[in-house]
């Protein structure tokens, strides 16, 4: 399995599918499934029974995972979707950078 280009906390843009063009912050990365949960995107409705946690019950909206092939990291310099590369910085540490601008992604 190859290394994933997306990490928790990244701002990503959807490049394909129903939410194409929308962006959000990554809440969780599901490595084995190669999917990510992005804040406010790919919303699904779940019917919940009343419980101690949710005494009212009803229909709840929540984020569903999106396959990482449909996501690109947003370039911090330009604000547009970009591919990610890896290179050694001046300290000899491997860092991610935006291919479009060359800006390091933290």
UniProtKB/Swiss-Prot annotation:
GO terms for cellular component: ribonucleoprotein complex; ribosome. It comes from Porphyromonas gingivalis (strain ATCC BAA-308 / W83). GO terms for molecular function: rRNA binding; structural constituent of ribosome. This is Large ribosomal subunit protein uL24. Transmembrane segments: none annotated. Pfam families: KOW, ribosomal_L24. Keywords: Ribonucleoprotein, Ribosomal protein, RNA-binding, rRNA-binding. The keyword Cytoplasm does not apply. It comes from the Bacteria. Part of the 50S ribosomal subunit. One of its GO terms (biological process) is translation. The keyword RNA-binding applies. InterPro entries: KOW (IPR005824), Rib_uL2_dom2 (IPR014722), Ribosomal_uL24 (IPR003256), Ribosomal_uL24_CS (IPR005825), Ribosomal_uL24_KOW (IPR041988), Translation_prot_SH3-like_sf (IPR008991). Belongs to the universal ribosomal protein uL24 family. One of two assembly initiator proteins, it binds directly to the 5'-end of the 23S rRNA, where it nucleates assembly of the 50S subunit. One of the proteins that surrounds the polypeptide exit tunnel on the outside of the subunit.
């Amino acid at each position: 399995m190859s290394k994933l280009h997306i990490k928790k906390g990244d701002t990503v843009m959807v490049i394909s599918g129903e939410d194409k063009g929308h962006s959000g912050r990554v809440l969780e990365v599901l490595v084995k499934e190669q999917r990510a949960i992005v804040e406010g995107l790919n919303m699904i409705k779940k019917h919940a029974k009343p419980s101690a946690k949710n005494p009212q019950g009803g229909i709840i909206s929540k984020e569903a995972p999106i396959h990482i092939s449909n996501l690109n990291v947003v370039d911090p310099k330009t604000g547009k979707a970009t591919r990610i590369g890896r290179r050694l910085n001046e300290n000899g540490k491997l860092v991610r950078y935006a291919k479009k601008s060359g800006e390091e992604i933290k």
